[in-house]
């Protein structure tokens, strides 16, 4: 009987949303690893389909062309938080999807409804298959992808803090330019008609501006453990 209870408690689904530079990926991976949960970076999937389109000559400025090509690539995400993977048509895409070119085009591609429908279905299938529980990070997880998640968390931070973190991740990047790029991405993601970046009404908001990564991780772990106990 106790084993069944433990399984029920461990199979929690956690949705972590928020804009770039708030610590979503680092926090989500660390929390999943610490609690023995699977991990899914949904942003990587949108980057992957964007990279595929750029590589295959799709005009990413043309929504109709994007919609027509959306179902062609086969995207597979590995959910081990210690070593998450992503492949496109069997090819490792973990490096190529992080280029500046992909970063500058991903919002346009991900705003196309046909793309979001396909990727959302993929994300839901991965979450459903994670019988031991999963941490899913993105921009519309709590509102659109997994509205029935056991716990929804929305990470925020000031534009300055986010830009500083992003600049630290990318060698030679300009802080001011990074800040402007983040603000532009926020506007694009929040303003799109299909599944915009938004905080779910029942999400717990965590402002990470003045917190260290470890403090954010500890905060989220506490929230997840509290949800498990209440389950």
Curated annotation (Swiss-Prot):
It is found in: Cytoplasm. Signal peptide: none annotated. InterPro entries: Cytidylate_kin, Cytidylate_kinase_dom, P-loop_NTPase. Its EC number is 2.7.4.25. Gene3D superfamilies: P-loop containing nucleotide triphosphate hydrolases (3.40.50.300). The keyword Acyltransferase does not apply. Disulfide bonds: none annotated. It catalyses: CMP + ATP = CDP + ADP; dCMP + ATP = dCDP + ADP. ATP binds at residues 18-26. Pfam families: Cytidylate_kin. Keywords: ATP-binding, Cytoplasm, Kinase, Nucleotide-binding, Transferase. GO terms for cellular component: cytosol. One of its GO terms (biological process) is pyrimidine nucleotide metabolic process. PANTHER family: CYTIDYLATE KINASE, CYTIDYLATE KINASE/PANTOATE-BETA-ALANINE LIGASE. HAMAP family: Cytidyl_kinase_type1. Belongs to the cytidylate kinase family. Type 1 subfamily. This is Cytidylate kinase. It comes from Streptomyces griseus subsp. griseus (strain JCM 4626 / CBS 651.72 / NBRC 13350 / KCC S-0626 / ISP 5235). The gene is cmk.
